[in-house]
Regions:
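Beta-strand-rich domains and repeat architectures in extracellular enzymes and scaffolds
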Residues: 1-17
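Extracytoplasmic beta-rich repeat domains
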Residues: 1-5, 30-52, 76-92, 115-138, ...
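Conserved beta-propeller blade signature
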Residues: 10-13, 21, 57-60, 97-99, ...
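Structural signature of WD-repeat beta-propellers
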Residues: 15-16, 62-63, 101-102, 145-146, ...
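Short loop/turn segments that connect beta-strands within beta-propeller blades
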Residues: 24-28, 71-75, 110-114, 155-158, ...
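Loop/turn-rich, solvent-exposed surfaces of beta-rich toroidal or solenoidal domains
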Residues: 229-241, 248, 252-286
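C-terminal closing repeat unit and adjoining cap/tail of repeat-based domains
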Residues: 274, 279-322, 328
């Protein structure tokens, strides 16, 4: 299941069979649209795909290699098929749709579904099927490829501005690659933050790609940045707070209270001035962003494989079985 998106009083979710759901905030299912190809109905895909939106349309990339433009009432404007599944959600920026497929092809489309440009990125076989998305700001489009390489390109034509990769610091360019992206790149002010599954968090200058700092923290989730701090759920089960400016670790807390836990954790999500973390142990945990202290934990009773989503004054949790639970 990909990341939920919200538009006014509706939440849209894409599942592993390419069913697109529209829910009201009170949990009422308004409509469902089966986007799977005819010959692949009821089959699960290993790639999550995802959803982007503007004021009028949803742009949905599926794990079956198709991308759709869909009105908010569920009617389809157009669809376009590509040769490879989409691992993550598209983004919509400057009236264009940008998305990466599992073969590391970056694709730019206009709102009518016409291809503007494509760019083949560095690729390698990976066991990770979770999706990451591009990011865009200040006439720069950031493309995270599965070989651990990030390219900054011009959104209008795909021309390269700079590129970097994990685990090398030769004057801002890098070619020694240790792992896939654990989360999507995040742009804050004039910095780019990116995290690898295999143990590195980098801060880069947005204009040049020059490395500002790095810290040995890996994650399978996109970091949260707030109030000068970066919050990361690490691959070894810790909630880590890092100084945004210099990369120093301010504190690190074991999420489960045990250093030997084999559980996996997802998040964090910042909502109501607290950090929320879900996990395969079936708990929703609430932490203080200032100190890392755990305030409470709620037993959900099902394995949770996704970070929680905050929409208005509600938290939404999706369990492994596909059940959606909302908290006020």
């Amino acid at each position: 299941i990909g990341r939920a998106v919200q538009q006014e009083c509706r939440v849209y979710i894409l599942d592993s069979r390419a069913n697109l759901y529209s829910f009201s905030l009170n949990g009422k299912k308004e409509w469902v649209l089966d986007l799977a190809p005819i010959l692949e109905k009821n089959q699960k895909t290993h790639h999550s795909g995802g959803i982007a939106l503007n004021q009028e349309n949803l742009f949905v990339a599926t794990g079956f290699g198709e991308i759709f433009s869909i009105k908010l009432d569920g009617s389809i404007n157009w669809k376009k098929r590509f040769d490879s599944p989409f691992r993550g959600a598209p983004i919509f920026s400057n009236n264009k749709i940008f998305v990466l497929n599992a073969n590391d092809l970056a694709i730019a489309l206009n709102k009518n579904g016409e291809t503007i440009w494509t760019l083949q990125g560095a690729t390698r076989p990976t066991l990770l099927s979770k999706g990451v998305s591009p990011a865009a700001k200040s006439n720069k489009l950031l493309l995270p490829f599965s070989a651990g390489q990030l390219k900054a390109v011009r959104p209008n034509n795909g021309a390269q501005i700079w590129k970097v990769a994990f685990d090398q610091s030769n004057k801002g360019e890098a070619y020694s690659i240790i792992g896939d992206f654990g989360g999507s790149p995040v742009i804050k002010s004039n910095k780019v933050f990116l995290v690898s599954s295999s143990g590195q968090l980098l801060a880069l200058n947005l204009n040049s790609g020059r490395k500002i700092w790095s810290v040995l923290v890996g994650s399978n989730s996109t970091p949260v940045i707030n109030g000068g701090s970066i919050f990361v759920v690490s691959t070894n089960g810790q909630l880590v707070r890092i100084d945004e400016n210099n990369g120093e670790v301010i504190w690190s807390r074991n999420i489960s209270g045990s250093t030997s836990s084999n559980e996996k954790f997802f998040g964090p999500t910042l909502a109501g001035n607290f950090l929320w973390i879900t996990g395969t142990d079936g708990y929703l945990r609430k932490f203080d962003p200032s100190t890392g202290k755990e305030f409470s934990k709620h037993r959900i009773g099902n394995q949770i494989l996704y970070r929680t989503y905050a929409v208005h004054d509600k938290l939404f949790i999706i369990t492994k079985s596909g059940k959606i639970i909302a908290f006020d």
